[in-house]
């Protein structure tokens, strides 16, 4: 109920010419190798660390992103790391650039909106490590977020206890609108097909469905009723 087409289409135009113009305007000049330079004269390089688990094809997504950034002179180096190392580096706020599939904007929006609202320090919520630490510690640690992020958090607090469904949906849309407008995270692919392999004689499995953490994968499709048809 929180989806708006404008959220999905925000900043999706592929326009390398405009991207180059904006980077030039920022003063990020290109060096002799074609890559852009930082203000100190060194090459601008970004380390993209991610956990290539089975939930989404992060490797393929990363390849495309690296290619697009390279085309405008930004050097991005992808690196696959383990889940445990990712957690350690996230907690220490050492990850420059990360990647994770975004969900929890459905049934779990009011309880686990980790990719849209700073809640705490989590290895999946790479976009708001120090803001999450600030909220979780009551302002004793981390970095105090800007007013817009405080408003996002405030809307979520109201959303959690909203008894009126229309008000809850309105608040949820305000949160997602802030993300779409401010690009707290950079979206890549939305609603991509997710094939599921099913053995020929397994029955009661739906041909089509929704796949995501919000639905606990196929839990909502009553897997307890699946059965193998005997010959």
Predicted features along the sequence, with ranges:
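Detector for C-terminal structural segments
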Residues: 1-5, 17-20, 56-66, 86-231
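Short, well-ordered beta-strand elements within core beta-sheets of diverse protein domains
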Residues: 11, 78, 157-161
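Immediate post-signal peptide segment of exported/extracytoplasmic ligand-binding proteins
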Residues: 13-47
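Short, well-ordered beta-strand elements
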Residues: 43-53, 76-78
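A mature extracytoplasmic/lumenal domain signature
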Residues: 50-52, 80-82, 190-192
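Short glycine-rich hinge loops at helix-strand junctions in the catalytic core
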Residues: 73
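Short helix-initiation/N-cap motifs at beta->coil->alpha
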Residues: 78-88
């Amino acid at each position: 109920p929180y989806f708006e087409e404008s959220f999905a289409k925000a900043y999706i135009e592929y326009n390398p010419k405009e991207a180059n113009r904006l980077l030039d305007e920022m003063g990020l000049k290109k060096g002799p190798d074609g890559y852009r330079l930082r203000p100190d004269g060194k090459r601008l390089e970004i380390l993209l660390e991610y956990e290539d688990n089975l939930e989404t094809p992060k490797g393929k997504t990363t390849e495309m992103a690296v290619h697009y950034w390279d085309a405008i002179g930004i050097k991005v180096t992808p690196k696959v790391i383990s889940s445990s190392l990712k957690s350690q580096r996230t907690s220490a706020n050492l990850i420059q650039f990360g990647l994770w599939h975004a969900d929890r904007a459905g049934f779990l929006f009011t309880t686990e909106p980790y990719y849209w609202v700073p809640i705490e320090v989590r290895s999946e919520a790479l976009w708001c490590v120090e803001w999450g630490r600030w909220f979780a510690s009551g302002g004793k640690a981390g970095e105090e977020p800007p007013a817009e992020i405080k408003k996002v958090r405030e809307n979520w607090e109201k959303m959690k206890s909203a008894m009126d469904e229309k008000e809850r949906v309105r608040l949820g849309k305000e949160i997602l609108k802030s993300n779409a407008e401010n690009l707290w995270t950079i979206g890549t692919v939305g609603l991509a097909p997710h094939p599921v392999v099913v053995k020929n004689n397994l029955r009661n499995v739906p041909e089509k469905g929704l796949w995501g953490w919000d639905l606990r994968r196929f839990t909502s499709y009553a897997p307890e009723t699946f059965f193998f048809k005997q010959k």
